[in-house]
């Protein structure tokens, strides 16, 4: 059976298009793989500091269980329905991330539907655009992206959140983020940051080795 020239040319064009798409896909895979490895290195560098801080707080509370600090202030006198809650929402800057952004956005929306007085502190352009379109209460002085995170930026973010908590603009602070369980499994998480819960700093969690530094 003969094939006319038009059909042959169309097939060749389709084949070239598929090959070009494969090249682009492979390039995107290599870039994302490189970024993933870099992110994992940064995480492994940061985790020891995080867990050692937890262990240090645990040791302090073990020896001084009655310690009072504003970060532990539960503010019992404020009714649950009247509590002002700050929600730090971590999303991506781009939409090509599957369910990554969708799951966090839906979890945040569900939480806000159950709590009346919520203020959003959104990290990432996708989340900011999403919640802006829905006319939700977003902190305007919080224009942070998630590309190339640095300690300086993290310090600026934490200073703003801590200030709002200590000034009683917020009674509670929560963070909504994605926990990476493996390269293919990720789980959205809703975690309370402030006030700190003493029960979470139990002595048996202080399993990290430590060194005392004595300064003059």
Region spans (language model):
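C-terminal beta-strand-loop-alpha-helix "lid" module of Rossmann-like NAD(P)-dependent dehydrogenases
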Residues: 2-213
């Amino acid at each position: 059976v003969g094939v006319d020239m038009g059909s042959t040319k169309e097939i060749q064009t389709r084949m070239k298009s598929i090959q070009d798409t494969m090249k682009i896909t492979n390039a995107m895979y290599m870039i994302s793989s490189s970024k993933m490895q870099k992110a994992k290195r940064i995480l492994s560098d940061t985790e020891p500091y995080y867990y050692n801080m937890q262990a240090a707080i645990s040791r302090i509370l073990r020896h001084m269980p009655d310690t009072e600090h504003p970060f532990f202030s539960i503010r019992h006198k404020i009714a649950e329905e009247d509590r002002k809650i700050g929600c730090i929402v971590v999303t991506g800057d781009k939409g090509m991330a599957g369910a990554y952004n969708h799951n966090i956005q839906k979890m945040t929306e569900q939480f806000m539907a159950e709590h009346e007085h919520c203020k959003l502190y959104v990290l990432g352009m996708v989340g900011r655009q999403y919640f802006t379109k829905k006319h939700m209460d977003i902190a305007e002085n919080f224009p942070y992206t998630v590309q190339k995170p640095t300690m300086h930026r993290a310090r600026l973010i934490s200073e703003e959140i801590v200030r709002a908590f200590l000034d009683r603009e917020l009674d509670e602070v929560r963070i909504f983020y994605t926990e990476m369980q493996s390269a293919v499994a990720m789980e959205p998480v809703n975690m309370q940051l402030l006030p700190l819960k003493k029960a979470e700093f139990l002595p048996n969690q202080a399993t990290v080795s430590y060194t005392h530094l004595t300064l003059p």
